[in-house]
Swiss-Prot record:
Native species: Chaetomium globosum (strain ATCC 6205 / CBS 148.51 / DSM 1962 / NBRC 6347 / NRRL 1970)
Keyword Hydrolase: yes
GO molecular function: ATP binding; ATP hydrolysis activity; damaged DNA binding; double-stranded DNA binding; helicase activity; telomeric DNA binding
EC number: 3.6.4.12
Name the record gives this protein: ATP-dependent DNA helicase II subunit 2
Organismal lineage: Eukaryota, Fungi, Dikarya, Ascomycota, Pezizomycotina
């Protein structure tokens, strides 16, 4: 199929299109243009010169078309609003101002189709194009059907698809029928339906269905991308005659779809006004009169006491990349940098085979590829087929080393035979495998037993689920099964969440917002479509159906509601009491903690604050934690205890915010900075301040974080920005 497209939209702008019908609060024109704007904005966003479109206005006040200019009758009140060609953002906004209802009924819909047909024939000539005419009307204007058969024959001859979408047109397949339809509209609707039926490639539908289907995300069609074209080898064919070599091609089977990117531009204001910077979709044309592209310029400076201002500029060519090694940086010149790269050659080599049973699916990493034999190469097809059947019969996978091109990073991939091998589609799927450094091995206690320190195995324990709980959970999982919850057209159970209907809400919500903003920059963006939110929560009907299993699970697990932990100063005097009402501290004879130790500072600090009955206790705890932070910094060998001190400081900050006493933290932090920068804490501890406190976002508590704070964001920023040391990880070569 040709990739070039030529589409002409015919929009009825008659006086009746300004009316509202069937309980809608928008006019027929606005209702129909929801479909047209969506299609046009999608074409503009694609930014492909081969996707062209034009717009014809029907029932316009003026007349502007080639047929009327040639003196032909019956083409009055038809205007070409946009000639066929690629459309830009500027043209889209100009077109928007032209779409206005008129005060006439004089335009004929079939004549409008002839105008659009002639535009397409003139533009496409005899070249390969997907030709399409889309008519949007409410069918209230008179239509002359004498030439409808000739028009249909001409559409068929030019291989043009005709799509007629009517506002409130009857559609038995969709299940819509307009009540109290006027005789004129019914007659026109019948005429247009007959015209579509005479076309080899025609579609007749109602606007209600077209607008409803706009909410369904459209998946961007992609062409097969060949990532590899070469030999798949087993052994070294250059050394051994018995080595296997099959010429294969590799294509992407799954690939992550990114969200639309954005770029920063400057919005050009009116003369005398200030420019404003905005972030827009990258597809925005920078030649637009409203926008100007932003160019980034970067300068490099180093400290130089002899230079004006104490700094001098350094050229980019004099810089060298450096890698952090402990607390120092190891520089690499451009010539030395090649040493760090692994020299590889394009290859696809099988290293060995493993059985199905020894492979864990969680090792799958990254995007999947599909490997097929080279086209029109019978020897390669036979060789790959033999390999696939051998893997399938022996229930084995192949492990291969894949290098896409010379100099590329090598990958380990798992080659899987196509499970549907009996469908005469023979291929290998490759899945990237992790290297040893990519694996994360963690030890967790078993879920079905408890191991004691003496090595005994306990099957019944308070930490293990009972048989009743296991059965209740099993019943709950079965009740929440989605595999057969939905119903197909024949009323049979089917999958509720098939993969081809689980759309990425981020991508399509972004596209929806971009299209809406492109068409009307001032209109509010509508909420996300329901289909994008469908899988954000379990189906309500399924939850209602599984309610008995849910209640049984709650009873078996003995789930009880725990009172929420109260926040704020007014609630700290009343600690949470257990549901039993017993005073655990008095029963155990333990007194409340009043001191904080260095080795267990964080839990003990939280314990004191949880039972604090007055402000003096909180101030004492904050003072003790502050002393511990100072001691950790002072006793630290280099930066050994900096992270620990920062963690204590973070806990102190969070707890004092929750208790609405930010002044204690702010007072301590101000004094801590003076101590650090003055060298009172046994040497130069500025790295603690700038890397761990400022870099860790542990600055003063501002009014944005706590309403009772007296510190503004500007004051907190000023405290962080004072006397920043020169810490850099780039080196430069002195060319003097």
């Amino acid at each position: 199929m040709a990739d070039k497209e030529a589409t002409v939209y015919i929009v009825d702008l008659g006086e009746s299109m300004a009316d509202c019908h069937n309980g809608r609060d928008e006019s027929d024109l606005d209702f129909g243009m929801r479909y047209v704007w969506d299609k046009i904005s999608t074409t503009v966003a694609a930014s492909r010169k081969t996707w062209t479109l034009g717009v014809v206005g029907l029932n316009t006040e003026e007349t502007n078309n080639a047929q009327d200019s040639e003196g032909l009758e019956g083409y009055e009140h038809i205007s070409v609003l946009q000639d066929i060609g690629p459309m830009t953002m500027t043209q889209l906004r100009e077109l928007r101002s032209s779409i206005q209802t008129s005060h006439t009924y004089g335009g004929d819909a079939i004549s409008g189709i002839v105008v659009a047909l002639a535009m397409i024939e003139l533009f496409t000539k005899k070249l390969k194009y997907n030709r399409r005419i889309i008519l949007v009307t409410n069918g209230e204007s008179p239509i002359d059907d004498e030439s409808s058969e000739d028009v249909a024959n001409r559409l068929n001859y030019s291989n043009i698809e005709l799509i007629v979408i009517g506002v409130d047109f009857d559609d038995a397949d969709y299940g819509f029928k307009e009540e109290d339809k006027s005789k004129g509209k019914a007659r026109n609707e019948k005429t247009l339906r007959k015209l579509v039926e005479q076309c080899n490639n025609g579609v007749f539908g109602t606007m209600q269905q077209a607008v409803e289907e706009l909410a369904i995300p459209r998946i961007k069609p992609v062409r097969p991308f060949k990532a590899y074209d070469g030999a798949l080898t087993l052994g070294d064919p250059e050394k051994y005659k018995s080595a296997l070599s099959i010429h294969v091609e590799r294509y992407f089977k799954t690939k992550r779809a990114p969200a639309p990117p954005a770029s920063t531009v400057v919005v050009n204001s009116e003369p005398g006004g200030a420019s404003q910077s905005e972030t827009l979709n990258e597809d925005t044309e920078m030649g637009d009169a409203e926008f100007s592209g932003v160019k980034h310029m970067r300068t490099y400076r180093v400290n130089d006491p002899d230079a004006p201002g104490g700094k001098r500029d350094v050229e980019f060519e004099d810089l060298a990349k450096g890698y952090q090694y402990g607390r120092t940086v190891v520089p690499f010149s451009e010539s030395d940098f090649s040493i760090t790269k692994l020299e590889t050659k394009k290859s696809f080599t099988i290293l060995g085979f493993i059985p199905f049973s020894s492979y864990n699916p969680f090792l799958n990493l990254g995007e999947t590829g599909i490997v097929v034999a080279q086209k029109h190469n019978e020897e390669a097809e036979l060789g790959l087929s033999a390999l696939i059947h051998a893997l399938h019969e022996l229930e084995s996978y192949a492990v291969a080393r894949y290098v896409q091109k010379d100099g590329a990073q090598p990958q380990l991939v798992l080659l899987k035979p196509n499970p549907a091998i009996e469908d005469d589609f023979e291929c290998l799927y490759d899945v990237p495998l992790p290297f040893a450094e990519d694996l994360r091995s963690y030890q967790f206690p078993p879920l079905d037993k408890v191991l004691t320190v003496t090595g005994n195995i306990i099957k019944e324990h308070r930490l293990l689920p009972s048989e009743d709980l296991k059965q209740a959970m099993s019943d709950f999982v079965d009740a929440m099964d989605l595999s057969g919850f939905d119903v197909d057209e024949d009323g049979k159970p089917t999958e509720y969440a098939p993969i081809d209907e689980t759309y990425n809400p981020t991508i399509h919500r972004m596209n929806q917002a971009i299209r809406a903003r492109a068409v009307d920059p001032d209109a509010p963006i509508k909420p996300p479509a329901e289909i994008l939110l469908r899988f954000s929560k379990p189906p309500e009907k399924l939850i209602e159906k599984a309610k008995p299993e849910i209640e049984a699970l709650i009873d078996a697990a003995e789930i009880k509601k725990v009172p929420a932990k109260a926040q704020g100063r007014g609630s700290r005097k009343e600690p949470v009491k257990p549901l039993s009402g017993l005073d655990i501290d008095s029963l155990l004879g333990e007194s409340k903690r009043t001191t904080i130790s260095l080795d267990n500072a964080v839990p003990e600090f939280k314990q004191i604050l949880a039972t604090a009955a007055d402000d003096a206790t909180i101030e004492s705890a904050a003072k003790q934690m502050g002393q511990i932070v100072r001691k950790l910094i002072q006793d630290s060998f280099a930066d050994l205890f900096y992270a620990r001190a920062a963690e204590n400081l973070r806990v102190m900050r969070e707890e004092l915010i929750s208790l609405e006493v930010p002044g204690l933290y702010n007072k301590f932090l101000t004094g801590l900075k003076k101590s650090i920068l003055s060298g009172e804490l046994d040497g130069d501890r500025r790295e603690m301040w700038f890397k761990h406190i400022v870099g860790g976002h542990l600055s003063l508590i501002t009014q944005d974080e706590s309403e009772v704070s007296e510190v503004t964001a500007e004051e907190a920023k000023a405290l962080c920005a004072w006397s920043r040391p020169n810490i850099t990880y780039r080196y430069f070569r002195d060319t003097a």
